[in-house]
Amino acid sequence: MPNNYRLEKVSSLLKKEITLILQNDLENDLIRDHFVNISKIDLSGDLQHCKIYITSTAQEKVRTEIVENLNTAKSSIRHSLGKRIEMRRVPEIIFKDDVVLDKGLSVLKLLDELKNKNQNHNVEDKDAKS
């Protein structure tokens, strides 16, 4: 089993090269028309399986379609990756939508709503005391 340093190094290399493939080699208008970014790569300890989490400025429905398109094109992406990097075996890849950003934004929205509600409540209390 490779050490953490090797996992991080290979993950970083995969992220860099897959980003370049998405930007330059992949001929998919949906992916090119929306800002698609790789947010995280989970690489298995044996370097055989790779989960690639993507973020995009697109709406959730479009992001789902982008992920489907990427998973449809994963064999050609993997083939291009094999030409770019020297590895004994290029890992099997699967693309997933990274929903962490959406969850974070919804939490911030809830916090803002609570803050506004609390401020309105404090103003009403001050008015009632006057």
From Swiss-Prot:
One of its GO terms (cellular component) is cytosol. One of its GO terms (molecular function) is ribosomal small subunit binding. It is found in: Cytoplasm. Belongs to the RbfA family. PANTHER family: RIBOSOME-BINDING FACTOR A, CHLOROPLASTIC-RELATED. This is Ribosome-binding factor A. SUPFAM superfamilies: Ribosome-binding factor A, RbfA. Keywords: Cytoplasm, Ribosome biogenesis.
